[in-house]
C-alpha cells in the first residue's frame, strides 16, 4: 500500500518514505500539564494515534515520542494559585492525562520525556546557537536572532509583518529584532529555575521540543506532529533553532514530514471548558 501524508512543509500530500525503512521515528508535541486535559488535547492525541497505528501496519519498527511540558509560566501560576509544589502538580496531571488517553483507547507513546529531565541538553543547544551566531545573551535573557536563519517562515509561509504580529512575544527593549524569541530567561526568587552560564533561569517553550526530539530520536527523523495552532510560532521556531546549526539551513535536517491536525470546533467559548476528567465515565 502506498501511504500518503499531508506535509505542512510542502502544503501537499506526499508519498511517505522513511529516513530508514527499518525504523520509523515520530515526535509529537504533548501537553502542558497544569490542569485537566481538554477535548482539544484529546483531538490531537487521537489524530496521532491514528497515524501511529497506520504506520505500524506498514513498517516493522515505529518509535513514537510525545513529550510532557512540566515547566511553563502557566504551570508556575497554577502551582502558586493552588499553593502546591510544581513537581506534585505536574506529576498529578501527567498521570490523569495518561489515564484519560487510555480511557479513549489512545496508546501511550513509547517514550514520554519530561522537559525538566532534559535541561542539560537545552543548555547545550543554547550554547551551540550562541557560538554559531544564531543567539545572543542580554540582561540574563538568551534570545534566538530570527534574521540569522535564512529560511524562517518556511513552515508557516508567513511574511515578515505576519511573523512579528503573530509571534505572541512581547517586544522587549533588549531584543535586537522584534521577532527574536526567548531561549532562556532569568528566574527571580522564588521562581523555579536551574543554574546556567547565563545565570539562574529556565528554558523557553520552543527550545524544549528541539532538545528533546533530538535527544530521543536523533536527527533527522521522519514525522513531527501537533495541532495546527502549533505551526506558528512553536514549530516555526523549532525549525529555526535546530536547522540554523546546519550550513544549508534545510528543514529536512530536522524532520521530513510535518503532520498537523485541524482544530476542533466547539460551541463553548473555549475547549478548555470541556475537560475530559469532568466528563462522566459512562460517556
Description of each model-found segment:
Residues 4, 61-63, 111:
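Conserved beta-strand segments of alpha/beta enzyme cores
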Residues 56-58, 84-85, 94, 98-124, ...:
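Non-catalytic interaction-recognition regions
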Residues 61-62, 86, 108, 136, ...:
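Residue-level detector of short coil/turn "hinge" positions at structural boundaries
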Residues 64-72, 114-116, 231, 258:
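Short, solvent-exposed turn/loop segments enriched in Gly/Ser/Thr/Pro and often Arg
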Residues 271-273, 277-283:
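Positively charged, low-complexity/disordered segments
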Amino acid at each position: 500500500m502506498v501511504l500518503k501524508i499531508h506535509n505542512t512543509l510542502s502544503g501537499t500530500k506526499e508519498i511517505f518514505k522513511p529516513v530508514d525503512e527499518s525504523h520509523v521515528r515520530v515526535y509529537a508535541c504533548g501537553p502542558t500539564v497544569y490542569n485537566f486535559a481538554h477535548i482539544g488535547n484529546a483531538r490531537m492525541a487521537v489524530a496521532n494515534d491514528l497515524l501511529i497505528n497506520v504506520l505500524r501496519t506498514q513498517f516493522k519498527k515505529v518509535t513514537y515520542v510525545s513529550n510532557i511540558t512540566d515547566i511553563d509560566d502557566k504551570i508556575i501560576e497554577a502551582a502558586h494559585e493552588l499553593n502546591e509544589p510544581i513537581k506534585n502538580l505536574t506529576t498529578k496531571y501527567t498521570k490523569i492525562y495518561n489515564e484519560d488517553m487510555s480511557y479513549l483507547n489512545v496508546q501511550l507513546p513509547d517514550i514520554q520525556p519530561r522537559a525538566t529531565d532534559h535541561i542539560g541538553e537545552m543548555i547545550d543547544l543554547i550554547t551551540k546557537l550562541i557560538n554559531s551566531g544564531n543567539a545572543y545573551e542580554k540582561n540574563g535573557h538568551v534570545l534566538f536572532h530570527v534574521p540569522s536563519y535564512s529560511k524562517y517562515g518556511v513552515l508557516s509561509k508567513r511574511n515578515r509583518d505576519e511573523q512579528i504580529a503573530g509571534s505572541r512575544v512581547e517586544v522587549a527593549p533588549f531584543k535586537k529584532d522584534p521577532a527574536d524569541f526567548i531561549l532562556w530567561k532569568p528566574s527571580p526568587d522564588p521562581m523555579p529555575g536551574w543554574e546556567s552560564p547565563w545565570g539562574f533561569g529556565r528554558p523557553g517553550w520552543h527550545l524544549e521540543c528541539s532538545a528533546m526530539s533530538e535527544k530521543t530520536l536523533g536527527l533527522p527523523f521522519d514525522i513531527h506532529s501537533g495541532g495546527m495552532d502549533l505551526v506558528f510560532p512553536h514549530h516555526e521556531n523549532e525549525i529555526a533553532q535546530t536547522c540554523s546549526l546546519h550550513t544549508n539551513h534545510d528543514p529536512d535536517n530536522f524532520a521530513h514530514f510535518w503532520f498537523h491536525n485541524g482544530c476542533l470546533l466547539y460551541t463553548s467559548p473555549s475547549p478548555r471548558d470541556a475537560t475530559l476528567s469532568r466528563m462522566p465515565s459512562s460517556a
